[in-house]
Amino acid sequence: MTANINKLARKNIQKLNPYQSARRIGGKGDTWLNANESPISVPFKGKVKVFNRYPECQPNNLLSSYANYVGLLNNQILVTRGADEGIELLIKAFCEPGKDAIIYCPPTYDMYAINAKIANVEIKEIPTFKNTWKIDLLNIRSNLNKVKLIYICNPNNPTGNIVSQEDLKSLLKVTLGQSLVIIDEAYIEFSPKNSMVNYLKTFPNLIILRTLSKAFALAGIRCGFTLAQKEVIDILHKVISPYPISTLIADIAVQSLEKKAIDDMKNRVLKLNMNRIWLIDELKKISCVKKVFDSHANYILVEFYMFKKIFQSLWQKGIILRNQNHKNNLKNCLRISIGSKSECMRLVQELKNFI
């Protein structure tokens, strides 16, 4: 019977390799440095006590809170189940299966390509330049035929680099009237001056993805935002599910956007950025480390000698890192999430033991 059920699945789904999230991969650790989560849990108490009614499709108080945070209007924002749902909804709303295409620029977040595969939308893969990780604007411009969406992660995951605003503006200009450019700013709180939010009024083809999972330390509630001009948001309203955000999630999200909570978030970011600077300096002194890439986020990409031995040994000791060896131009690389100071110190000490 199992074989018959598999045959009922769509052909592209039968061939699909699902995204391997940190939790799906597993591991039995006590030092989790593989999912770019906050090492600090932020306590919130639910204020809402009534749950017998369905929530608003788009909780107005949450829209207002986030609009105030980013300096936009409510009708320029869509609340989603993490930024991941925003990635999916954009493909669902704008790409014709078997006809249209997306562009993405590996090494980067895999869910752009996986969502396109699920929707049977063509993927045009245009890698960034090795080591600098700059986007290949000339190659992108030459491959715009059939392309509806271009996904750029900024800061980029897993490399940690920033795509310059000049490059992004050039991309937006060349695609105006033809393609939408989606800037995934999941990690932008760690480098806020590089946000493209202020350009939403200038470029109607600009869309920005945000989340509460990283700097806001709320990965467990799955709450994200799509920012765009009203016309784009109106289209996305047509394809989002009726009740995407639960009453409890909206309640916690609103609390996280209060002034004190935002101030606390900025202080956590400051500490994590200091930990990142310290960790980069320490890693550069260790003999098994071949190269440490600069980062503007809460993680570092590191190329190792004895890559496999190091990854497995740390795993067995309960220090869980993210393997990037299989990705474009990332041979022998691991991504290290910035943890607490004690977690970073433990990692450094273990790495010093390798000869």
Swiss-Prot record:
Superkingdom of source: Bacteria
Enzyme Commission number, as recorded: 2.6.1.9
EC class name: transferase
Pathway where it operates: Amino-acid biosynthesis; L-histidine biosynthesis; L-histidine from 5-phospho-alpha-D-ribose 1-diphosphate: step 7/9
PROSITE patterns: AA_TRANSFER_CLASS_2
N6-(pyridoxal phosphate)lysine modified-residue sites: K214
Keyword Transferase among record annotations: yes
GO terms under biological process: L-histidine biosynthetic process
GO molecular function terms attached to this record: histidinol-phosphate transaminase activity; pyridoxal phosphate binding
Entry keyword set: Amino-acid biosynthesis, Aminotransferase, Histidine biosynthesis, Pyridoxal phosphate, Transferase
Pfam families: Aminotran_1_2
Catalytic activity, as annotated: L-histidinol phosphate + 2-oxoglutarate = 3-(imidazol-4-yl)-2-oxopropyl phosphate + L-glutamate
UniProt cofactor(s): pyridoxal 5'-phosphate
Subunit text: Homodimer.
NCBIfam families per record: hisC
Stated family: Belongs to the class-II pyridoxal-phosphate-dependent aminotransferase family. Histidinol-phosphate aminotransferase subfamily.
Record-given protein name: Histidinol-phosphate aminotransferase
Originating gene: hisC
